[in-house]
């Protein structure tokens, strides 16, 4: 855990809880009880929330910002496994076992998180069994997304990999605007290239081609608008 964290001064416990699906269904009184158990911390861009091999003692909820979960391949290349953003949680699987962290989680920007200790988390699972069911559902959803990603990585056609990534981003990080879907990209071009296992120059060239084709429009290095999401979806049909 980073030693440079400090108390979050502008987020509220209940706000964190309402963003997380596993707490859905709890009444106001229960929410207040749980909110008293939560600790807030802030991490700067580039700081690690935890590292590969750490013993974890808390479930972490993203209140503001986004993080990447990654590890290095035997060749020394960074491989991003998950991206977590507002309302997502992680670390729960390690609180239910004695395993150490299988990846490092690093802030992609200024991040505010809410932390619930292992002891409190386990007590809540006993008190609210529905939480356990929702955690299993979330883990299943993550496994499905990971399998979908691995399937797309097995496709040699780089265009299809990039299409899949943009479609995933539109669902997780996109917001509707007049022209289409605005995506605040969580990763740089280099990060996206690492995620897909391709060269940075390749993804820059392919994104430029999509822009020339009128499918996307680049706003900045950190934002694009998908103008024609149907073309991306049709490009993936019958492949994944």
Description of each model-found segment:
Residues 171-240:
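Phosphate-/nucleic-acid-contacting segments
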Residues 22, 47-110:
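Cyclic nucleotide-binding regulatory domains
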Residues 82-144:
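Cyclic-nucleotide recognition modules
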Residues 1-45, 90, 94-96:
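Cyclic nucleotide-binding regulatory module and flanking cytosolic helices
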